[in-house]
Swiss-Prot record:
Glycans are attached at residue 30. Disulfide bonds join 55-84, 87-154, 92-97. May cause loosening and extension of plant cell walls by disrupting non-covalent bonding between cellulose microfibrils and matrix glucans. No enzymatic activity has been found. Keywords: Cell wall, Cell wall biogenesis/degradation, Disulfide bond, Glycoprotein, Membrane, Secreted, Signal. Belongs to the expansin family. Expansin B subfamily. Transmembrane segments: none annotated. It comes from Arabidopsis thaliana (Mouse-ear cress). This is Expansin-B5. The keyword Signal applies. GO terms for cellular component: extracellular region; membrane. Residues 1-28 form the signal peptide. Pfam families: DPBB_1, Expansin_C.
Length: 264
């Protein structure tokens, strides 16, 4: 009897520990240090830079939850598309700046931004957000600045992950972009499970778009398993792409990565 009780107690401890670890919110990048980068800006003064960015987010960058707070990244940030979706905190010490950090997401590529080892080509809205009240245009008129930056957790409260199916997708070729991911913001692996099938790994394109060409027609509904790039956390968007799906459509899931505590 004592042996059975001990085994039961041990099982409960292991199970409790498992859930404590599994359900713990993402605390990614809290311990990263501030480094130096260069910034410029492009597009309209209060705009998103462009809605045709290389990452493939389209006009979503101008809407909730991104609200134009995005940036093109130089080669060290864009990382041949693997940097798409990553979030960064920036702060500026110029007299026109508030010195309070802002947060931006990488949504585009700036291949010519190589003057510094790390360079953000910000949207006009994001560049101006660094400024003191009423000083946005004066700051933008400077054109170029040095800032401090560090990697940050993406945080989109009350927003679930969405799957934006590519306009060229068909039963033999599935491709889509994942939007609104909390935490790391980008992915180490994305897998698709068609109806009655097994999970299949997708190929990351040079953007936030992932694709799969299985050689046979795929039928929905589809489960999507997402593995976060840095933390390695996994979530499954069950049935997020329905049986009767359409190319170009956006499908909203019921899941997202846990939102972390406030960063310093």
């Amino acid at each position: 009897m004592a042996s059975s009780s001990l085994k039961c107690f041990s099982f409960i401890v292991v199970l409790t520990t498992f859930f404590a670890i599994s359900l713990k919110p993402c605390y990614c990048h809290n311990k990263t240090h501030w480094n130096t980068a260069g910034i410029t800006w492009y597009g309209d003064r209060e705009g998103p830079g462009t809605t045709g960015g290389a990452c493939g987010y389209g006009d979503a960058v101008a809407k909730h939850p991104y609200r134009c707070m995005v940036s093109a990244g130089g080669p060290s940030l864009f990382k041949d598309g693997k940097g798409c979706g990553a979030c960064y905190r920036l702060k500026c010490d110029h007299p026109l700046c508030t010195k309070k950090p802002i947060k931006v997401m990488i949504s585009d590529e700036c291949p010519g931004c190589t003057k510094e080892s790390v360079h953000f080509d910000l949207s006009g809205k994001a560049f101006g957000a660094l400024a003191k009240r009423g000083k946005g245009d004066q700051l933008r008129n400077l054109g170029e600045l040095k800032v401090s930056y560090k990697r940050a957790c993406c945080k989109h409260p009350k927003t679930m992950i969405a799957i934006h199916v590519d306009a060229g997708a068909n039963p033999y070729y599935m491709s889509f972009a994942v939007k609104f991911a909390n935490g790391d913001g980008n992915f180490a692996c994305i897998e698709v499970q068609p109806a009655g099938g097994q999970y299949m790994k997708m190929e990351e394109m040079r953007s936030a778009v992932w694709r799969l060409s299985p050689g046979v027609p795929l039928k929905g509904p589809f489960n999507i398993r997402l593995t976060s790039a840095v933390s390695g956390k996994k979530i499954i968007a069950k049935g997020v792409i329905p049986e009767k799906w359409s190319p170009g459509a956006i499908y909203h899931s019921k899941v997202n990565f846990p939102v972390q505590r406030k960063q310093k």
